[in-house]
Swiss-Prot record:
This is Major DNA-binding protein. InterPro entries: DBP_sf, Viral_ssDBP_head, Viral_ssDNA-bd. The keyword Glycosyltransferase does not apply. Plays several crucial roles in viral infection. Participates in the opening of the viral DNA origin to initiate replication by interacting with the origin-binding protein. May disrupt loops, hairpins and other secondary structures present on ssDNA to reduce and eliminate pausing of viral DNA polymerase at specific sites during elongation. Promotes viral DNA recombination by performing strand-transfer, characterized by the ability to transfer a DNA strand from a linear duplex to a complementary single-stranded DNA circle. Can also catalyze the renaturation of complementary single strands. It comes from Epstein-Barr virus (strain GD1). GO terms for cellular component: host cell nucleus; viral tegument.
Amino acid sequence: MQGAQTSEDNLGSQSQPGPCGYIYFYPLATYPLREVATLGTGYAGHRCLTVPLLCGITVEPGFSINVKALHRRPDPNCGLLRATSYHRDIYVFHNAHMVPPIFEGPGLEALCGETREVFGYDAYSALPRESSKPGDFFPEGLDPSAYLGAVAITEAFKERLYSGNLVAIPSLKQEVAVGQSASVRVPLYDKEVFPEGVPQLRQFYNSDLSRCMHEALYTGLAQALRVRRVGKLVELLEKQSLQDQAKVAKVAPLKEFPASTISHPDSGALMIVDSAACELAVSYAPAMLEASHETPASLNYDSWPLFADCEGPEARVAALHRYNASLAPHVSTQIFATNSVLYVSGVSKSTGQGKESLFNSFYMTHGLGTLQEGTWDPCRRPCFSGWGGPDVTGTNGPGNYAVEHLVYAASFSPNLLARYAYYLQFCQGQKSSLTPVPETGSYVAGAAASPMCSLCEGRAPAVCLNTLFFRLRDRFPPVMSTQRRDPYVISGASGSYNETDFLGNFLNFIDKEDDGQRPDDEPRYTYWQLNQNLLERLSRLGIDAEGKLEKEPHGPRDFVKMFKDVDAAVDAEVVQFMNSMAKNNITYKDLVKSCYHVMQYSCNPFAQPACPIFTQLFYRSLLTILQDISLPICMCYENDNPGLGQSPPEWLKGHYQTLCTNFRSLAIDKGVLTAKEAKVVHGEPTCDLPDLDAALQGRLYGRRLPVRMSKVLMLCPRNIKIKNRVVFTGENAALQNSFIKSTTRRENYIINGPYMKFLNTYHKTLFPDTKLSSLYLWHNFSRRRSVPVPSGASAEEYSDLALFVDGGSRAHEESNVIDVVPGNLVTYAKQRLNNAILKACGQTQFYISLIQGLVPRTQSVPARDYPHVLGTRAVESAAAYAEATSSLTATTVVCAATDCLSQVCKARPVVTLPVTINKYTGVNGNNQIFQAGNLGYFMGRGVDRNLLQAPGAGLRKQAGGSSMRKKFVFATPTLGLTVKRRTQAATTYEIENIRAGLEAIISQKQEEDCVFDVVCNLVDAMGEACASLTRDDAEYLLGRFSVLADSVLETLATIASSGIEWTAGAARDFLEGVWGGPGAAQDNFISVAEPVGTASQASAGLLLGGGGQGSGGRRKRRLATVLPGLEV
């Protein structure tokens, strides 16, 4: 755990005093209701909805998400401040029906209520008092019918809002500009701020708002903790927040356990560990969520690049619609994946005596089957009878996913269910080959239009939730009860530091101590710097970071030259990198075995996508991970203090305080969750605040109130780290077969080689006359050694092309251990670079593990299979449906796999990935428990088509197991959508590019006279300006190779005197005529024998120190042993 920061450099201390929240009033006449609807969770008939907190549409620009909330006055002359941050979403409660629904399907509220009952979760119980009337919280002069009302609430006091214990003070209204609307906000203070008390009628309470919080927020928390009494959980959270009871056990009496736990041989310990893990999550998760957070750039809605080219409100709504479509795969994955974090069902304990580590014997399990089973309370008394599931197959048993399971995933909230359904509308159906079904049109006009439909009664068949469920039914996961230790899928924003290149964190020199001072002339050459240098070299060749070319090849000669230039750039960088490693005595052969791909999951709620669904997923992910990392700690404590027949609440009464106190040092910063502890202070003993007692009576006075902090220490979460080992080092035979590289030469080495996708892209350019496909042409060449030559083309050029492709593919086949076929030149260059490094490290036997990104691509398709485009109109027949949809299109989304995730990770992506948290102890007698978050696998065949087992590339059938060495991550870049791309602080001058290009040419051609190429490049870049170059100009342009200045100037003078045109082609032809080409001068050379000793030479010059000489000799010998075996 990092030490506490000083008061002046943490966000909590820098925040300003303020209220516990605000009620915002937006004028309906100017407020962009359709944009709010596209961001919100409205459904047909909603009375309250949630919308993300965003500067420029729900709050004013410059809104501070961190505040020191004045929440109590122990006496009239002292105030207590508490540092907290705002909740990620706001709640629209007044005139909410004016916001259009995001999903138009009817009947969601009744469906959620019925499903909540069958799953045993309690419904919201309104307080025994009426909701506040608009006159109680509206400022004077505002017409309640002309404004939309919403609450922005802080994390620490959202339970006080839920229970109606905040007080609105309309006299303290402030006018703010929210977007283009002149809005008003009214502060909310805790009733404890008023020592003399506040009449209940003045306390702000809205039953629709509290019901929305109960369903959309707190039910999800209860599901993550596996408790069904949601209202009681909210009471306990409020009590913990007010009375600082984080170290007191609270939720254990609410826990319920399935039959698998009750019947377990070690059920007592299992129940105690499960309950203790939940208690720790309840104690620490709220503290982390309410901590001060950095304000991300994506919070500024009014500066989203998404709207840069939008003209008018319609274009803005369409842009938001496309942005939502790019987020749909993350949401659908959580629904379609069997191991979704939404389906985590409990804690299990392994009973076998396998090789599983003792610390991994307790683990989180998932399964919808477990979630609908009967449960018992901590005293082993039945409390929920269970639900058998709908009669879908006539067997009256679980096994088939039903609409009720989708409602469970949405936390029985009609708001969240509407948002989930909206995202699922973007998904394509995958029809099972085993169950032929009627067409969508027949279903919509038939069964969906029947009055028997429980949701729409046949009035809105096109947008009914049952119709959507019918269209996607083959993608939903099976309902089963599993006790396996599988990964669970989490979703959220990626952290800022990811190492996802082919070799991950190889040679990053982070967390490695320096034993001694390093000379200034020996800087560390990291793997990250190597990749940056490679990209710079490629940019000089006209290849951008995404692999796009400035100048496309126009024939076989250009095609071969393009690859030879890239090969030369890669080889030069490899040699320099290997030289640096050998020079610095780096044990790279050992380091490559322990390198990982590293991804970070951000713990900042405001970094998450602007969507209430992702707020729910973030809360669920954080709570599940906190429980997971606490399991071995609870297990060890229970082993030392066995329950001996005690129920979990009884055991926790005596041990929880010690367990909770030690958890911070035992679990944080131990490999998975990183956090910092900050000390929050208020710099002044007093602060200027309005006189709240007078303001309550409508009088406005200011006063200087003495204040102090009620809570000093704050735990600020940073990131969750997920790793993936790059080089296979295991002993498992099945896994080994998946990674081992076959030694037999494949017949179709060209098709699976590095050039195939480029040969296909430029097929019509290279072979304009042929009717053969590129796949067949090159497969045929690998067997018959013949290629077609277009009429009028040079046979020699095509022969050179074929020989280059053949030779390069054969060499690639021998050395390649990176199982991708590159799709652009950057991936090609990185594959060649990393293959060379791995060969130098001796890693040639096994393929390395890869992370591939699944990046969403939106597209417009005919609306025949997407009935929701028809809206709520009636459908009489299948023919009428076909006619109505024939002219319409629907926006859908598909995912494309990227070969290398590193470029996507630079764009601050939203990620969805499976994670397994392994626990282990340290080495050399260190008995501390550490954790490692490892990247896992998705379960469920309906998740995405890219995850289905493919037959392989080309014409061969690939043996099963290739997917074992490829891990997948769903990634949606946000750079350019919600975050502006960074512009260069300083513009690059043309002369800098010329200088860099000349130095690159000389560096790559040190073994030959490069003046010819330097002059031609200079003429190409500067033209006639070459004639007036001075010696100083030439020395600057040549940089560290300025000794060539005289030769270059002489050659330029020769060209100037000839009177030819100042173009690269003319200069090249002229110099070839004069010199016969580069290096054509024939000189006589004599052989000079190597001197036998150096003693006689040493006396004539400086005598070098023995230590330096020996060290240099050792490094040279080491380099000499590396480079001959390095094929580049």
